[in-house]
Amino acid sequence: MTMTDPLGDMITRIRNAQLRGKGKVVTPASKLRGWVLDVLAEEGFIRGYARVEYPGGKSDFEIELKYNEGAPVIQMIERVSTPGRRVYSSVKTMPTVHNGLGISILSTPKGIMSDVAAREQNVGGEVLCRVF
C-alpha cells in the first residue's frame, strides 16, 4: 500500500522520537524530505541527517535530533498543508510562528525554504509545516 502523505509521516516520526527522547530517527528517503531536512538543519532544529543506502536501491535518512539541556529543541512540529487540504500563502499574508521564534517551511517556485528566506526573496508558496 502506498503512503498518501510521506512528509506528514516524517514529521510524525520526528515528533514521536523527540517525545520519547530518542537521539536518532530513521525515515525513508525522498527529495522532498531531504529538502525539508536541509531547512531544519539550517535553522538549527536538528543536528543533521545522513542518507543510508541499502542493497536493492532503497535508501533512508537517519536524522540526528537535537536537545537543549535534556529538552527537545523542536517543541512543536505540525503539518499545515495536507494532500486533501492545500494551504497557500503570499508574502503579505504569511503568518509568523510564535512571534518569529519558530518557522514555517514553504514550497515556493524557488525551492523549499523557511518563511524568513521566502520574505527576503519576496516569494510565497505552499505552507508545508510549522516548527517551533
UniProtKB/Swiss-Prot annotation:
SUPFAM superfamilies: Ribosomal protein S8 (SSF56047). Keywords: Ribonucleoprotein, Ribosomal protein, RNA-binding, rRNA-binding. GO terms for molecular function: rRNA binding; structural constituent of ribosome. It comes from the Bacteria. GO terms for biological process: translation. One of its GO terms (cellular component) is ribosome. The keyword Cell wall biogenesis/degradation does not apply. InterPro entries: Ribosomal_uS8, Ribosomal_uS8_CS, Ribosomal_uS8_sf. Belongs to the universal ribosomal protein uS8 family. One of the primary rRNA binding proteins, it binds directly to 16S rRNA central domain where it helps coordinate assembly of the platform of the 30S subunit. Part of the 30S ribosomal subunit. Contacts proteins S5 and S12. This is Small ribosomal subunit protein uS8. It comes from Parvibaculum lavamentivorans (strain DS-1 / DSM 13023 / NCIMB 13966).
